[in-house]
Amino acid sequence: MTVPARLVTTIAAPLDPASSEAPRVLHRPGRRLLVQRGDTEVVALDLDACVAGRASEVRFPAPWPRRFGTVAVSPGRDAAVFAGVHAVRSVEASGATRWEVRHGCWYGGCSLAHSSFDEYALDEDHRYADSGSVAVGADGGLVWAHVRAPLGGDAGAEGDQELWAVLDAADGRVLGRVDTMTAASGSEHTPHPDPTRMGLSVGEGEEGSPALWGRWDGQRLTAVQIGTELVLLAVSPSGGHLLTVDVGQWSLSLHRAEDGSLLRELDARDAVPPHPRSTGEGRVYWDCDAAFVDQDTIVAGTSECDARYGAARHWLVDARGMALRGEVSYPFPVSGPVRSAGDGAWYTVSEDRTSVHLWKPAGEN
C-alpha cells in the first residue's frame, strides 16, 4: 500500500552548500524556523512567512567556524546560541555577545580553561574535539546545554565530568545542572512542547548511546535515563510520547514521556519489505530521524540502507499500534531521511542541499 504525499512548498537554502551545513527546520508551538549554519554566519528564516511567499530572514555572525560546535536559534530569532569547544555563547543579530558561559574544553587531552577561541583555533587536535550541544526551550526562556565541567568557574568539578545545565536565556545565569555520567563524542537535544522538559541523546562512539529525559521544576533540574543504547527521535504533538530508535537501528519504539517506559515497538526486519532492487545482501533498518505527523501518525525512513539501491523510501506508521500503514509516494524522487517540520508536516533536503521540501499527507491542508 502506498500513501501519497503532497508538496506544500520548496524553499531555497539561504547559504552555499559548499561552505555550510544542510538546512534544518526548528519548530516550537506557534513558530517554525528554517536554520542554516555556515562558517561565518547562521541564517534563520521564518518558515511560515516563506510558505506564504514573504521571505523574512535574520543573520547572526558566528563566533567560530561550524566544525567547532553546534548552534540553536531562539523561537523569536532574537539570539543564536552557539555551543563551542570551550563556551556556550548567545549572540544577537548585530554581532553583540548577549552572554557567554565558559566550560571545560571538549578536547580530552586539554586541561586548560580557555578564554577565547583564538587560543586553539590553529591547533589540529582541537579541530577534532568531542562536542556537546545546546537547545532553546519552546518559549525561548531557557537554554539547555550539554557541556564539560567545570562550568562557569565552578570549583572542585572533575575535568572529565559532563553536565547538563539549564541557563536563563536572557543573561546566561546557570539555574540548574546534573551530572550526565556520560563520555560523549557528540550529543543532540530533542525539544518538548513544554519548555521545562527536554531530551538529550549522547553518542559515546562504540561505548553506547545514553538517552536522557530532563525536567526543570523552577528550582531543580532532574534527569532520568530512558535507555543506554537509544537515540531520541521525536516528541508527539501532545508531549505525551517519545519516539526512539536503538543504536543498531532495528526497532522504532514508542515511550511514555512521563517516565520513559516502553509502550510499543516496530521492528524494521518484520515490517519493511526489502528494496525492490535489493540483491538480498544487507538488512533493512530505520534511519536515525523520524517525525510525528500528528498524535497518531509517524513518518519514518529507511533511506540509509536504501541508498545503495536508489531512491529513499519513507513510511507512515500508525502510532497507536506501531503498525506500518504504507510507503509514502512522492511526486518526484526524494533523498535522505524525514525530519519534523511541525504543523503536521515533515521535510526532506535535496541531494545537493540547495532546497528544502515540505510535505503533508495528500488531502490534508
Question: Where are the predicted features?
Answer:
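Sequence/structural signature of beta-propeller modules
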Residues: M1-R32, R37-E41, V349-N365
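Aromatic (tryptophan-biased) beta-strands that constitute blades/sheets of beta-rich domains
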Residues: M1-S20, G53-W64, T97-C105, L175-G176, ...
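Loop-centered beta-sheet repeat module
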Residues: A5-T10, L15-A18, Q161-E229
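Repeated scaffold domains used in trafficking and secretory/extracellular systems
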Residues: P14-P29, R59-D78, C105-G137, D179-D194, ...
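Short beta-strand elements that form the blades of beta-propeller/WD-repeat-like
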Residues: R24-A44, V73-S90, G140-A157, D194-E206, ...
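Beta-propeller domains
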Residues: L33-V58, A87, V91-G95, R102-H103
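Beta-propeller blade signature
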Residues: G159-G172, A211-D217, R256, A311-M322, ...
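Loop/turn-rich, solvent-exposed surfaces of beta-rich toroidal or solenoidal domains
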Residues: V245-S253, D267-R320
